[in-house]
Amino acid sequence: LSDAPRDPFAALPPDAAELAVRWAEAAFLPEVDAELRAIHGDMASATAAHGPVCDASGRCCRFGEWGHLLYVTGLEAAWCLRAAARTPTAAEVRAAAARDDCPFLESGRCGVHAFRPVGCRAYFCDPRAAGWQEALSERMLARLRALHESHGIPYRYGEWRTMLAHFAA
């Protein structure tokens, strides 16, 4: 993929460390946690209504192989890391970028499945999902943006490994 970062750290803005602190602090706010969980719950309900098939193959985590990139907000990255209680090291983020997969891919499965971002929750290999997943994703992304705005959280939307690099730097 031409847009995939060769080195996620090269794309970091000058204020990356400050942004990471702001996002991490916000991820620990009970009201932010509750709103993120509500977004994920609503997304799960809407997804279930469509009945997509997930074969738990881990294909969604192998970005280059399947021709897609994962984009997330900084807050989502911070919340995922908080919930998972693990931040990939700089070496792990770089290695994932070199493999063109997710640093949380473990033994062919998602290592943060319960805490995964909206983009992961919207993506299904099931071809029947193509008709509805984009619209659902856009609705949930609008809610994420509104969450940022309502709490004064800096909004950035970027490629997953680059957003993780904010925290591993």
Regions found by a protein language model. Give the residues of each.
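Short loop/turn segments that flank or connect secondary-structure elements
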Residues: 1-169
